[in-house]
């Protein structure tokens, strides 16, 4: 009798353990599936862009790039101040052509403040990604205040320019090697030697590849990166290269760069900045 009772308890215990194991396995599978289904968050912030500024609007000249990104990112757009609350859950932050002056009779745009620098530095060092896009002259570009932020990562914009170029990137270039960059004119990035964020050029201006239009061809970095703390920063010296007309190869300013891989370059940069692995690409690869 006692033996039968003991065997019954053993069977019950075994069934209970099996049920718990299956439950735990199911929960783990669901969690893994949910994690895989969640896309990294890309925030296109318009906070530093002046009210009334028509360049690079999310439903304008940046509509196509943001539409494509939605296939791999949870793309969000807003003009709210950048702080701990608005950056919560954001994997990569995009800032394009921050405005210097007011547009028309609108209020002047916000410039980077000490509080912003603190919040954004913490965000990046704790694992966030930042992509900042500069530009050429006459684009209402603000760099003085923005550089105070970028210098935290050993990077800074300059007022030295290079005209439109069709750049074949060396195959050994990390992340974007072997691709063709349609570069539509911009400034240069300086890097600070020995900085703890490990700033370095990713794309140096290849003087052997001549401008398609214009004569400015300044040696230096057209795209530079840094890795402060657990985060990733990419600073690019042109904002028009991911606009609708650049991606469609209609061209900008009367110059059309054919065969460019601008979407694939930005896609890879966005994944690198977000700390995620890029899936199979949709255009040319190495």
Predicted regions and their residues:
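Short intrinsically disordered, low-complexity coil segments enriched in acidic
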Residues: 1-2, 104
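Bacterial N-terminal signal peptides that target proteins for export
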Residues: 2-17
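Bacterial N-terminal signal peptides
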Residues: 15-29
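Short, surface-exposed patches at the edges or C-terminal ends of soluble domains, predominantly
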Residues: 32-286
């Amino acid at each position: 009798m006692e033996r039968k009772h003991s065997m019954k308890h053993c069977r019950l215990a075994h069934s209970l353990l099996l049920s718990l194991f299956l439950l735990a396995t199911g929960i783990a599978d669901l969690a893994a599936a949910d994690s895989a289904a969640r896309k990294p968050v890309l925030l296109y912030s318009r906070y530093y862009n002046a009210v009334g500024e028509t360049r690079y609007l999310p439903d304008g000249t940046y509509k196509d790039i943001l539409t494509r990104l939605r296939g791999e990112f949870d793309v969000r757009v807003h003009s709210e101040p950048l702080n701990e609350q608005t950056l919560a859950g954001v994997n990569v932050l995009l800032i394009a052509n921050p405005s210097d002056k007011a547009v028309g009779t609108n209020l002047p745009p916000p410039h980077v403040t000490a509080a912003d620098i603190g919040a954004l530095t913490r965000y990046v060092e704790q694992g966030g990604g930042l992509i900042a896009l500069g530009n050429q002259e006459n684009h209402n570009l603000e760099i003085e205040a923005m550089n105070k932020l970028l210098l935290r990562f050993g990077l800074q914009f300059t007022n030295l320019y290079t005209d439109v170029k069709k750049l074949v990137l060396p195959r050994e270039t990390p992340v974007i090697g072997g691709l063709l960059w349609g570069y539509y004119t911009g400034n240069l990035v300086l890097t600070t030697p020995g900085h703890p964020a490990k700033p370095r050029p990713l794309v140096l201006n290849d003087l052997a590849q001549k401008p398609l239009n214009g004569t400015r061809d300044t040696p230096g970095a057209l795209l530079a990166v840094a890795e402060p703390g657990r985060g990733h920063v990419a600073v690019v010296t042109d904002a028009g290269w991911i606009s609708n007309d650049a991606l469609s190869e209609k061209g900008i300013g009367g110059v059309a760069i054919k065969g460019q891989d601008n979407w694939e370059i930005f896609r890879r940069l966005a994944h690198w900045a977000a700390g995620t692995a890029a899936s199979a690409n949709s255009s040319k690869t190495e």
